[in-house]
Amino acid sequence: MKASNILLLPGWQNSGPDHWQSRWEAAHGYQRVEQHDWMRPLRGDWSARLEETVADADGPVVLAAHSLGCILTAWWAAHTRHAAKVRGALLVAPGDVERPDLAAQIHGWAPIARQPLPFPAVLVGSRNDPYCSFECAEGLAQAWGARFVDYGERGHINAESGLGDWPDGHALLHTLLKD
Protein backbone atom coordinates (compact mmCIF):
# COMPACT_ATOMS: atom_id res chain seq x y z
CA MET A 1 0.00 0.00 0.00
CA LYS A 2 1.26 3.46 -0.87
CA ALA A 3 2.05 5.70 2.10
CA SER A 4 -0.33 8.35 0.78
CA ASN A 5 -3.18 5.84 1.10
CA ILE A 6 -2.77 5.79 4.86
CA LEU A 7 -5.05 8.62 5.90
CA LEU A 8 -4.49 10.51 9.15
CA LEU A 9 -7.65 11.89 10.76
CA PRO A 10 -6.76 14.35 13.53
CA GLY A 11 -9.26 15.54 16.07
CA TRP A 12 -10.49 18.94 17.16
CA GLN A 13 -7.80 21.64 16.79
CA ASN A 14 -5.67 19.36 14.57
CA SER A 15 -2.51 17.53 15.68
CA GLY A 16 0.55 19.63 16.51
CA PRO A 17 4.13 18.88 15.41
CA ASP A 18 4.92 16.57 18.36
CA HIS A 19 1.75 14.49 18.01
CA TRP A 20 2.28 10.93 16.77
CA GLN A 21 0.10 11.64 13.71
CA SER A 22 2.31 14.55 12.66
CA ARG A 23 5.43 12.50 13.31
CA TRP A 24 4.08 9.65 11.19
CA GLU A 25 3.18 12.09 8.41
CA ALA A 26 6.73 13.51 8.41
CA ALA A 27 8.51 10.17 8.74
CA HIS A 28 6.39 7.98 6.45
CA GLY A 29 4.55 10.30 4.05
CA TYR A 30 1.07 9.40 5.27
CA GLN A 31 -1.66 11.79 4.15
CA ARG A 32 -3.40 14.07 6.65
CA VAL A 33 -7.03 14.72 5.77
CA GLU A 34 -7.06 18.51 5.95
CA GLN A 35 -10.26 20.00 7.30
CA HIS A 36 -11.52 23.48 6.46
CA ASP A 37 -11.91 24.56 10.09
CA TRP A 38 -10.05 22.74 12.86
CA MET A 39 -11.33 25.07 15.60
CA ARG A 40 -15.07 24.95 14.81
CA PRO A 41 -15.58 21.45 13.41
CA LEU A 42 -18.79 20.77 11.54
CA ARG A 43 -19.61 17.08 11.26
CA GLY A 44 -21.10 17.42 7.78
CA ASP A 45 -18.10 19.34 6.45
CA TRP A 46 -15.58 16.98 8.00
CA SER A 47 -17.47 13.94 6.72
CA ALA A 48 -17.69 15.42 3.20
CA ARG A 49 -13.94 16.06 3.20
CA LEU A 50 -13.23 12.46 4.26
CA GLU A 51 -15.67 11.18 1.61
CA GLU A 52 -13.87 13.22 -1.06
CA THR A 53 -10.43 12.03 0.06
CA VAL A 54 -11.39 8.34 0.12
CA ALA A 55 -13.22 8.60 -3.21
CA ASP A 56 -10.17 10.23 -4.82
CA ALA A 57 -7.70 7.65 -3.45
CA ASP A 58 -6.18 5.48 -6.17
CA GLY A 59 -6.62 2.28 -4.22
CA PRO A 60 -7.57 0.95 -0.81
CA VAL A 61 -6.96 3.12 2.25
CA VAL A 62 -6.30 2.62 5.95
CA LEU A 63 -7.50 5.24 8.43
CA ALA A 64 -5.48 6.34 11.49
CA ALA A 65 -7.82 8.48 13.57
CA HIS A 66 -7.39 10.32 16.86
CA SER A 67 -10.02 11.77 19.20
CA LEU A 68 -12.75 13.50 17.18
CA GLY A 69 -11.29 11.76 14.12
CA CYS A 70 -12.58 8.47 15.60
CA ILE A 71 -16.07 9.91 15.98
CA LEU A 72 -15.83 11.19 12.40
CA THR A 73 -14.83 7.73 11.18
CA ALA A 74 -17.89 6.09 12.76
CA TRP A 75 -20.27 8.76 11.45
CA TRP A 76 -18.76 8.70 7.97
CA ALA A 77 -18.82 4.88 7.83
CA ALA A 78 -22.56 4.92 8.51
CA HIS A 79 -23.22 7.16 5.49
CA THR A 80 -20.49 6.57 2.90
CA ARG A 81 -20.70 4.85 -0.46
CA HIS A 82 -16.97 4.10 -0.29
CA ALA A 83 -16.61 1.84 2.76
CA ALA A 84 -15.30 -0.98 0.54
CA LYS A 85 -12.15 1.08 -0.11
CA VAL A 86 -11.23 1.00 3.60
CA ARG A 87 -9.03 -1.95 4.61
CA GLY A 88 -9.07 -0.97 8.27
CA ALA A 89 -9.03 1.77 10.87
CA LEU A 90 -6.82 2.50 13.86
CA LEU A 91 -9.00 4.47 16.28
CA VAL A 92 -7.07 6.14 19.09
CA ALA A 93 -8.54 7.85 22.17
CA PRO A 94 -12.02 8.69 20.87
CA GLY A 95 -13.54 11.85 22.29
CA ASP A 96 -16.84 11.40 24.12
CA VAL A 97 -18.79 14.19 22.40
CA GLU A 98 -21.93 13.11 24.27
CA ARG A 99 -20.47 14.39 27.55
CA PRO A 100 -22.08 17.75 28.39
CA ASP A 101 -18.73 19.55 28.77
CA LEU A 102 -17.50 18.41 25.35
CA ALA A 103 -20.89 18.78 23.65
CA ALA A 104 -20.89 22.43 24.76
CA GLN A 105 -17.54 23.02 23.01
CA ILE A 106 -18.03 20.81 19.95
CA HIS A 107 -21.57 21.37 18.69
CA GLY A 108 -23.47 18.98 16.46
CA TRP A 109 -21.40 15.82 16.90
CA ALA A 110 -23.74 13.97 19.25
CA PRO A 111 -25.08 11.39 19.18
CA ILE A 112 -22.09 9.19 18.39
CA ALA A 113 -22.77 6.67 15.61
CA ARG A 114 -22.69 3.25 17.24
CA GLN A 115 -23.26 0.86 14.34
CA PRO A 116 -20.68 -1.86 13.58
CA LEU A 117 -17.99 -0.56 11.26
CA PRO A 118 -17.96 -2.17 7.80
CA PHE A 119 -14.18 -2.73 7.98
CA PRO A 120 -11.71 -4.12 10.54
CA ALA A 121 -10.77 -1.73 13.33
CA VAL A 122 -8.59 -1.50 16.42
CA LEU A 123 -9.54 0.98 19.15
CA VAL A 124 -6.82 2.06 21.60
CA GLY A 125 -8.09 3.49 24.88
CA SER A 126 -6.42 4.98 27.94
CA ARG A 127 -7.54 4.49 31.53
CA ASN A 128 -7.07 8.19 32.36
CA ASP A 129 -8.14 9.94 29.17
CA PRO A 130 -9.65 13.29 30.20
CA TYR A 131 -11.92 13.31 27.13
CA CYS A 132 -13.34 9.80 27.27
CA SER A 133 -13.83 7.42 30.18
CA PHE A 134 -12.29 3.98 29.86
CA GLU A 135 -15.77 2.46 30.04
CA CYS A 136 -16.99 4.65 27.19
CA ALA A 137 -13.98 3.70 25.05
CA GLU A 138 -14.63 0.00 25.71
CA GLY A 139 -18.30 0.48 24.85
CA LEU A 140 -17.48 2.23 21.58
CA ALA A 141 -15.09 -0.57 20.62
CA GLN A 142 -17.82 -3.12 21.28
CA ALA A 143 -20.46 -1.13 19.35
CA TRP A 144 -18.13 -0.60 16.40
CA GLY A 145 -16.93 -4.23 16.36
CA ALA A 146 -13.35 -3.08 16.96
CA ARG A 147 -10.63 -4.98 18.78
CA PHE A 148 -9.99 -3.08 22.02
CA VAL A 149 -6.47 -2.34 23.25
CA ASP A 150 -6.07 -1.18 26.87
CA TYR A 151 -3.11 1.21 26.69
CA GLY A 152 -2.95 1.83 30.43
CA GLU A 153 -2.69 5.33 31.84
CA ARG A 154 -1.54 7.39 28.85
CA GLY A 155 -3.90 10.37 29.02
CA HIS A 156 -5.36 11.34 25.64
CA ILE A 157 -2.65 9.39 23.76
CA ASN A 158 -1.32 12.56 22.18
CA ALA A 159 1.84 14.71 22.31
CA GLU A 160 1.38 15.31 26.04
CA SER A 161 1.53 11.54 26.60
CA GLY A 162 5.24 11.56 25.68
CA LEU A 163 4.93 8.82 23.05
CA GLY A 164 7.35 10.27 20.50
CA ASP A 165 6.92 8.37 17.23
CA TRP A 166 4.65 5.91 19.10
CA PRO A 167 6.08 2.63 17.77
CA ASP A 168 3.37 0.61 19.57
CA GLY A 169 0.69 2.45 17.62
CA HIS A 170 2.59 2.04 14.37
CA ALA A 171 2.78 -1.71 15.01
CA LEU A 172 -1.01 -1.76 15.51
CA LEU A 173 -1.45 0.14 12.24
CA HIS A 174 0.66 -2.48 10.47
CA THR A 175 -1.62 -5.27 11.74
CA LEU A 176 -4.38 -3.61 9.71
CA LEU A 177 -2.16 -3.44 6.63
CA LYS A 178 -1.59 -7.21 6.82
CA ASP A 179 -5.26 -8.14 7.18
Predicted regions: what is each one?
Residues Q31, Q142-N158:
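Catalytic histidine neighborhood in serine/cysteine hydrolases
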Residues L117, V122-G125, D129:
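Short beta-strand/loop motif that positions the catalytic acidic residue
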Residues A159-H174:
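Post-His helix in hydrolase/transferase enzymes
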